[in-house]
Amino acid sequence: KLSKELSRRATGKTLYILDEPTTGLHFEDVRKLLEVLHSLVDQGNTVVVIEHNLDVIKTADWIIDIGPEGGDGGGAIVATGTPEQVAEVPESHTGRYLAPMLDAARSAAE
């Protein structure tokens, strides 16, 4: 279903909501999915992704980190912002794991 929908011509007026789209995908397939999603955004569409994969999270324009735990321990907004901003929030489990990835990417770019 996902590949069929994403292969349609983008109108620039569509809201895409994806729940864990990387589940079961190979790393290369995740990379291809990210290319498609970023292309949809570049064409003016809005893409909302519910995801735990840090390779996807680190490419987001904006993150809403909900937690801090799952189930009864969750449901609160822990952090919002760019990946860099979320990585600076001590209460964010996502930020804690995201920070080293962002640091490594910065070091590789230098």
Curated annotation (Swiss-Prot):
Protein family per UniProt: Belongs to the ABC transporter superfamily. UvrA family.
Keywords per UniProt: ATP-binding, Cytoplasm, DNA damage, DNA excision, DNA repair, DNA-binding, Excision nuclease, Nucleotide-binding, Repeat, SOS response
Protein name (Swiss-Prot/TrEMBL): UvrABC system protein A
Cellular component, GO annotation: cytoplasm
Primary location group: cytoplasm
Role noted for this protein: The UvrABC repair system catalyzes the recognition and processing of DNA lesions. UvrA is an ATPase and a DNA-binding protein. A damage recognition complex composed of 2 UvrA and 2 UvrB subunits scans DNA for abnormalities. When the presence of a lesion has been verified by UvrB, the UvrA molecules dissociate.
Oligomeric and partner information: Forms a heterotetramer with UvrB during the search for lesions.
Signal peptide from the UniProt entry: none
Species: Paracoccus denitrificans
Location(s) in or outside the cell: Cytoplasm
Biological process annotations from GO: DNA repair; SOS response
Disulphide-bridged cysteine pairs: none
InterPro entries (alphabetical): P-loop_NTPase
GO MF annotation list: ATP binding; DNA binding; nuclease activity
Gene3D superfamilies: P-loop containing nucleotide triphosphate hydrolases
Tree of life domain: Bacteria
